[in-house]
Amino acid sequence: MTTLKITGMTCDSCAAHVKEALEKVPGVQSALVSYPKGTAQLAIEAGTSSDALTTAVAGLGYEATLADAPPTDNRAGLLDKMRGWIGAADKPSGNERPLQVVVIGSGGAAMAAALKAVEQGAHVSLIERGTIGGTCVNVGCVPSKIMIRAAHIAHLRRESPFDGGIAATVPAIDRSKLLAQQQARVEELRHAKYEGILDGNPAITVVHGEARFKDEQSLVVRLNDGGERVVAFDRCLVATGASPAVPPIPGLKESPYWTSTEALVSDTLPERLAVIGSSVVALELAQAFARLGSQVTILARNTLFFRDDPAIGEAVTAAFRAEGIKVLEHTQASQVAHVDGEFVLTTGYGEIRADQLLVATGRAPNTRSLALEAAGVAANAQGAIVIDKGMRTSTPHIYAAGDCTDQPQFVYVAAAAGTRAAINMTGGDAALDLTAMPAVVFTDPQVATVGYSEAEAHHDGIETDSRTLTLDNVPRALANFDTRGFIKLVIEEGSGRLIGVQAVAPEAGELIQTAVLAIRNRMTVQELADQLFPYLTMVEGLKLAAQTFSKDVKQLSCCAG
């Protein structure tokens, strides 16, 4: 019996593919591959090449060494032989060829789908017109959270609840150095989590160019280095994401305004920043720039968080105004001018002047250039691709996932949708259930929600009961000397089952997943109250909020069970 040590496997399906590859090597009688142990136990004929074994595994993107021998790099020339033995990932076993899957895009949905499809035995062609990695790692989640964190630290140096004992200072902010640090981490993560993974997987072919449908079975790709290529497919996933939407305000397009993309890579901090919009992106970046030293004015068409429980918008608005951020509710710009380096915004309440303008009113699906009609793929009036719970479009073998659909615009939703689309494309049956989907807004205090608000429950005919616990009842908040915010629990009347949680609190995003699991497991509020929660954690606030349905928590000792 020969034993190989294998590194790089991430699941049982990986082990299954390694087993299949090894058993195609001449001389291998059987292979028992274990993902948890990282080993392969082989029954082989005398004279079987050990290099052939390790190269077969390497062809799948993993590394293998003989358990009783030092690693060897002597694999030159063997990869071509291995391709003949195992079919080179894009050749069939027997008379069949692998399923040909095309993925358009390279963000969260696209990557998840590509990796799952390969795991299921397909060959994937991934088409990307721009930078590998999509919005999240390049111009979205990652750089924005780095900027927000830096701004938070600057804010704490300027003022904190402990200024009486720790002298406040005015931080010297070098935006260019912060930007260099931010972009270095972006590039590091893009390579580690996207480019490196794609380069190391022989079953994925990356095509750099812009795709459009030719018909229901093929795409025309305008290659970035010139020319065009037709790419045929058995299954296709559209995962092209979304881009900042720009409202039709007279004069706006003629001005040098920012979207979030430009704001995140600017190496300067405007003295005065006007923000059109009250989207998640608008609010996160508005507070970040304010904390880094800009005078910020937000123009909100409605109130902040107007689609959510009213208490959320009230709490965040109060927090913003306390920091000196101007929040102008029910205010729209009717015209934008840029004169002598200054933006002038005309509103119903007078003019607003600023050195820079950020437009963050939402995001629009990247679907206009795809020629969806050529493949019979339906989209709604906003350009979002219409899909069912299995991510199928109106053309059954064409799928879509992520921000190019009408799914909630979160990268973890996109990735989950991409994975399930790949399962369905390769013969499985998977649906995306968003009934317990968490959402987090990285303002300070943070906003975190899951499940129903009271208004949403009533709209669906569900009778509710609710309790709101202010943070001056949460020991962690008291110890922090920061009691801004609240935790609200919504339950189904009668059953007592938890159906929704809304939280406004520092690090609210760190407590919401506990609420997700409680809702997913159909826990009652009493069952939640009976659980053990560690003392002096913010998530303990969930237990205290649950206890308010049956008792006055103000009358409890610090850590009463």
From Swiss-Prot:
Presence of keyword Flavoprotein: yes
Instruction: Tell me its cofactors.
Output: FAD
Pfam families from the entry?
Answer: HMA, Pyr_redox_2, Pyr_redox_dim
Task: Please tell me where Hg(2+) binds in this chain.
Answer: 558-559
Organism domain of life: Bacteria
Pinpoint the HMA domain residues.
1-65
Task: Describe the reaction catalysed, as an equation.
Answer: Hg + NADP(+) + H(+) = Hg(2+) + NADPH
What EC number(s) are associated with this protein in UniProt? 1.16.1.1
Q: Which positions form S-S bridges?
A: 136-141
Gene Ontology MF, one: mercury ion binding
Could you state one GO biological process linked to this protein? Answer: detoxification of mercury ion
What does the entry comment about cofactor binding? Binds 1 FAD per subunit.
Q: Which annotated residues bind FAD?
A: 110, 130, 135, 145, 211, 403, 411
Chain sites annotated for binding a metal cation: 11, 14
Q: Which UniProt keywords apply?
A: Disulfide bond, FAD, Flavoprotein, Mercuric resistance, Mercury, Metal-binding, NADP, Oxidoreductase, Plasmid, Redox-active center
Q: What else is known?
A: The active site is a redox-active disulfide bond.
NCBIfam families, per the entry: MerA, PRK13748.1
Assembly with partners or alone: Homodimer.
Entry's PANTHER family? MERCURIC REDUCTASE
Protein task: Resistance to Hg(2+) in bacteria appears to be governed by a specialized system which includes mercuric reductase. MerA protein is responsible for volatilizing mercury as Hg(0).
Q: Which family does it belong to?
A: Belongs to the class-I pyridine nucleotide-disulfide oxidoreductase family.
Could you tell me what this protein is called?
Mercuric reductase
What organism is listed for this UniProt entry? Acinetobacter calcoaceticus
Lineage of producing organism: Bacteria, Pseudomonadati, Pseudomonadota, Gammaproteobacteria, Moraxellales
Underlying gene:
merA
